[in-house]
A protein has these predicted regions:
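N-terminal "first-domain core" detector
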Residues: 1-24
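Secondary-structure transition/turn motif
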Residues: 2-7, 70-78
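Short, well-structured hydrophobic secondary-structure segments
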Residues: 17-49
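Generic structural signal for well-ordered, non-transmembrane alpha-helical segments
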Residues: 31, 65-68, 103, 107
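Short, structured protein-protein interaction patches enriched in aromatics and acidic/basic residues
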Residues: 46-68
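Mixed-charge, glycine-accented linear interaction segment located at domain edges/termini
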Residues: 78-145
């Protein structure tokens, strides 16, 4: 679940649905959000696909040090990727134009990623994604973007 100011997007699935629902792992979400942060250091517009939905995107528009976050609907064209830099005719979704400072967005993602690494390490030292996500966190913390 993503929360920006008081607006929320996404679902937190109950544990009993884990075996029957095909869903994107938290690692994948964190990896994609890390790429959004990196791209926002270079570009003013980044759209992150909600790969679990038909046509929903999380849109990030950066102006100076502020990022405006919106949920938008736009067709996922053939050959599109999980992150795009231009959407064709996006339409406002559940909420829009929530403003957050770029530094705060970056800090929040790093903190939540750290909490996730700590949680899965404590809960299950055999978790297959622990090493990958720990490397992602360390790399993210080293980068100055």
């Amino acid at each position: 679940q993503i929360k920006c100011n008081e607006c929320k997007y996404g679902e937190i699935y109950p544990k009993e649905l884990e075996t029957v629902m095909d869903k994107v792992s938290l690692y994948d979400w964190f990896e994609r959000l890390a790429r959004v942060i990196k791209y926002l250091s270079l570009k003013d517009y980044v759209a992150l696909s909600d790969v679990e939905s038909y046509n929903t995107w999380i849109e990030f528009r950066k102006t100076n040090e502020e990022v405006m976050v919106s949920i938008v609907k736009a067709e996922k064209e053939e050959g599109s990727h999980d992150i795009e830099f231009n959407l064709k005719e996006p339409i406002a979704g559940e909420w829009e134009k929530q403003v957050i400072r770029y530094s705060q967005l970056k800090t929040e993602i790093i903190e939540k990623l750290g909490e996730y690494v700590e949680f899965i390490t404590i809960s299950n030292t055999e978790h297959p994604e622990i090493e990958k996500i720990d490397e992602l966190l360390k790399g993210f913390q080293k980068c100055d973007f």
